Amino acid sequence: MLLPVIMAGGTGSRLWPMSRELYPKQFLRLFGQNSMLQETITRLSGLEIHEPMVICNEEHRFLVAEQLRQLNKLSNNIILEPVGRNTAPAIALAALQATRHGDDPLMLVLAADHIINNQPVFHDAIRVAEQYADEGHLVTFGIVPNAPETGYGYIQRGVALTDSAHTPYQVARFVEKPDRERAEAYLASGEYYWNSGMFMFRAKKYLSELAKFRPDILEACQAAVNAADNGSDFISIPHDIFCECPDESVDYAVMEKTADAVVVGLDADWSDVGSWSALWEVSPKDEQGNVLSGDAWVHNSENCYINSDEKLVAAIGVENLVIVSTKDAVLVMNRERSQDVKKAVEFLKQNQRSEYKRHREIYRPWGRCDVVVQTPRFNVNRITVKPGGAFSMQMHHHRAEHWVILAGTGQVTVNGKQFLLTENQSTFIPIGAEHSLENPGRIPLEVLEIQSGSYLGEDDIIRIKDQYGRC
């Protein structure tokens, strides 16, 4: 059986404003009801696999846990990186965790934010890779190129190992992102693949090769795993140890150096959705080449991508535009300038604007909070608490709160007193009062919260007790 190891780190800044640092693209629902992370998991349906292991940023832990819970795939299988150290250490953490009890699984390493539309072809390639990984090779999946792309690294194939629909080859070399002229030459030669960043190998084989070429990375990761906190859902890697680990990609650390690298070609309608232009290319279009998502309308317009999270967007007489509207930001640009989105993100960071980091709607382990109005002296929030969800028992030094129940039933605790509130009822939480809110019902609890006081920062939440381990 295969152990899927899903790399869910990264910030996805090229899909701003939908993708934010605290809610990056791998958690977005761009093509239906499932997020990209969830699609990565469901795409493996039909293969013999263990429960997936997901590696993510510590700040995304509750997002990942909730999305795995929705798939019934949550079982102490989330590794939390306190800092990003690239793919070689991340895979090492997964391999060390997987071999703790003497097992040596075949690891299928996947990115959480890729699209692979031809699932049968993908599964066929996995089965071919499985044979060679089981024999001790380190297999990488090379994407059959259809254009002289300069945004991907390339893999040059060497000697063919067999003759089949997915002929595996020895890896001749890995190549950095080329200029246009070299990319065209690679495409014409037929000897090169795009580097997908997907791999398969035995866990212990990867660790032995890492020990051979980068023992410093292995040593740091081993120390981190030995000191990890294994909770019910999360495997928390300690910051003070892991921050000493070198930052290195698996290509540089292992794949370019090993004598056992094999590449399996994959022609399965793959995309890493690395820009708004790429998303337009892989999305279904109308007769004029427009992609419309959400509340959008066009007239006499061609080849546009329009995505509206909430507001109506109407476009008339335009072409080749990307228009993305969220609750707190709007992006308008020429589709050919998709790579320049990062300049907007850099501007927001430099000017300490929160829009690069978080959406107006913030996700919590208990549900979500939509910041409707935000001022220095008061905030108005629309809060949704999922069934069974609960605030921590907490208090504030500088703010009071008013809660109005819009829908559902809330169990409120204030200074030890517990009572129920239902629709159209309200309560007041004074400054300094210990308080909590829980949803004991079976439907979402909707609450209008008004915060007022001299200071409204998140660091004025003094947690006393918390079922999510945030104290």
From Swiss-Prot:
Q: Which CDD domains match?
A: cupin_PMI_typeII_C (cd02213), GDP-M1P_Guanylyltransferase (cd02509)
User: A single GO molecular function, which one?
Assistant: mannose-1-phosphate guanylyltransferase (GTP) activity
Endpoints of the signal sequence? none
Q: What class of enzyme is it?
A: transferase
Q: Which reaction does it catalyse?
A: alpha-D-mannose 1-phosphate + GTP + H(+) = GDP-alpha-D-mannose + diphosphate
Which Gene3D superfamilies does the record match to this protein? Jelly Rolls, Spore Coat Polysaccharide Biosynthesis Protein SpsA, Chain A
Give, as in the UniProt entry, the pathway in which the protein acts. Answer: Nucleotide-sugar biosynthesis; GDP-alpha-D-mannose biosynthesis; GDP-alpha-D-mannose from alpha-D-mannose 1-phosphate (GTP route): step 1/1
**Cysteine pairings via disulfide bonds:** none
Keywords per UniProt:
Capsule biogenesis/degradation, GTP-binding, Lipopolysaccharide biosynthesis, Nucleotide-binding, Nucleotidyltransferase, Transferase
InterPro entries per record: GMPP_N, Man1P_GuaTrfase/Man6P_Isoase, Man6P_isomerase-2_C, ManC/GMP-like_b-helix, Mannose-6P_isomerase_type2, NTP_transferase_dom, Nucleotide-diphossugar_trans, RmlC-like_jellyroll
GO BP terms: namely: GDP-mannose biosynthetic process; lipopolysaccharide biosynthetic process
Listed EC numbers: 2.7.7.13
Role of this protein: Involved in the biosynthesis of the K2 capsular polysaccharide biosynthesis.
Q: Which family does it belong to?
A: Belongs to the mannose-6-phosphate isomerase type 2 family.
| The protein's name | Mannose-1-phosphate guanylyltransferase
Per the UniProt record, the lineage of the source organism begins with: Bacteria, Pseudomonadati, Pseudomonadota, Gammaproteobacteria, Enterobacterales
